[in-house]
Amino acid sequence: MANKRIEPADRLSLVQEYYFSRKLKEVAQLNAEGKDIISLAIGSPDMPPSDQTIEKLCEVARQPNAHGYQPTQGTPELREAMSGFYKRWYDVDLDSKSELLPLIGSKEGILHVTLAFVNPGDSVLVPNPGYPTYTSLSKILGANIVNYDLREDNGWQPDFNQLEEIVSGTVPSVGTTGGLSPKPRLLWTNYPNMPTGGRAQMKTYERLVQFAQEHGIVVVNDNPYSFILSEEHLSILQVPGAKDCCIEFNSMSKSHNMPGWRVGMCASNAEFISWILKVQSNIESGTFRGIQLAAAEAYKNSDEWHRVANIERYAARRKY
C-alpha cells in the first residue's frame, strides 16, 4: 500500500521563499560559474563594526558565565544602551525597563507585532513599493493586505488622501487579498525608504501620527537607515504623542555595520511593549550574552566613527 502523501500547511501557498534569500542563491550560483557579479540583492554593509565592539565580544565570550540562557527582554546593559542611543541621536526619552524591547533583528519584530495586534481577517496597510516581509508575514498570519502607493512625484511619501479613502471604505478593492475590514489595524511605513531611497520627513511623521490618532490605527515605522543618507537622524517618536499610537523598529545592521549579529529593537509605550514581549517570550529565548554586551558597547561609538563609517563612506560611493 502506498504511503499517504503529507502536505504542507495551506498558508505556505500564500508566500514564496523570502525574496532576498532567493536572490542570494542566484548570485552565489552565478559566482560559482565564474561570472563577475555586482549584487543588488540584500543591502549588507561590507565594513566591519568598531574595534571596541569586536574586543567586547571576545572579552565576554571568554567569561564562563556568558553562555547560559539570557533574559528574553534583553540584558539591562543592552536595554540601557538602546535607551541612551535614542536620547543621544533622536532626543527621545525611553524607559529602558518598559518602553523598548531588543529583537533578533527587525524582521523578527514584524512577526511579533503582527501577532500582537492583528487578528486573522483584519486589514493591514502596506506601502507599495515596500519591504516584502510586511506583506508575506501578514499573509501567513491571515491578514488582508491593503496597499497604499508611494510615488516618485511625491518624494516617495504616503498619499494621505488615498489613505483616508481606504480607511473610509471608498476604495475597498485596491490592493486587497480579501474583504476590507471597516478599519485597518496596522500601517507599516519605512523611512528612509527601502527600496526607493525616499528620505524621512518630519512633516510626514507628523501626518502619520495624526492619522493614527484619528483612526485608532497603530503605525509601525521601520527605521534602520536613518544613519545612511544624511546627518539628520529622524524618528517618528520625536513627534509629540507618537509613543501612544506608534511603534518604531531600529537596527544595528546598517548604522553599526552589524547585519549578521541580528540585533534590533522596537520602541513604544509600555503597554504595547508588554503585548509584544508576551509574543516574543513564547517564540525565542534571548540572544547570546556576548552579542548583547558587545552591542551595548557599539552604541558608545563616537560621533567621528559614525561620520566616517556611515555618512562619508556612503556619500563617496554615491559619487563614484
Task: Give the ranges of each region predicted by the language model.
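Active-site phosphate-binding strand-loop segment of PLP-dependent enzymes
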Residues: 146, 150-234
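Aromatic/hydrophobic pocket-lining residues that form π-stacking "cages" and hydrophobic walls in ligand
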Residues: 23, 27, 134, 208, ...
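N-terminal small-domain helix-loop-helix segment of the aminotransferase-like
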Residues: 2-105, 112, 298-301
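Helix C-cap/helix->beta junction micro-motif
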Residues: 33, 141, 214-215
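Conserved PLP-anchoring active-site segment centered on the Schiff-base-forming lysine
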Residues: 116-138
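Short, intrinsically disordered, charge-balanced linker/junction segments flanking boundaries
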Residues: 164-168, 313-320
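Conserved core segment of the aminotransferase class I/II
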Residues: 241-315
